[in-house]
Amino acid sequence: PSTSACCYASIHTGVPPQVHGILSNENRFRVEQPDIFSEVSKAGGKTGAVTHSYWSEFFRAYPFDLVEDMEYDEPAGPITHGRFHTMTGYNLKNQMTPSDVDLFATLTMLTKRHAIDYGILHTCTLDSMGHRFGHDCHEMDHACYAMDGMLAAFLPRWRDAGYEVIVTADHGQTDRGHHGGHDDEMQDFALYYFGAAKGPEADTLLDQLQLAPTVLSRLGVEIPSTMKAKVFLR
């Protein structure tokens, strides 16, 4: 399903929801399969996450403790440096989303202060705007424009620091602001890569399950046997 939590777990484990078991946003627990965080940490690397709290629940510990888990630095943990938000109280009139520039700055801080080897930044802004307004509208045009400008200010800094960058999404969305099904507009989304690797042709249709093994391969980390999808960057 093109549901957020299901996609989060698949992006990092490289297995479908039917295998990792996260089948809805309400069905959450610490997943059992190896994931990007666990494998990078096992290989001696440092990881960082600036994301919704679901990522902490799936890849560190469930349930999420609002006080203890909002920020942590754990040298021995799968997520070495975590900075999270919950969006508690979210509804169509109050999105409860942090400013994206704050998230970009926080991830950049982790790269500078802790020299993380792998980091993920997750924002719900465009998803929430789509749910509220749909897509063919001035509000969404401006949201995409604003996000683009914020990202443009940080992307060169990450590249100058030696990082390869993948910009993508967990799912698509209909013009009514819905996702969760199997229609192309719910499942298809863009992927942009900034780095030295060679990738497929621009119109290639990739599988979301390819992300985890591809990221590990770029980091020089052994890919676990559970991640069976083909690496797409060389």
What are these regions, as identified by a protein language model?
Residues 105-153:
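Active-site His/acidic residue clusters
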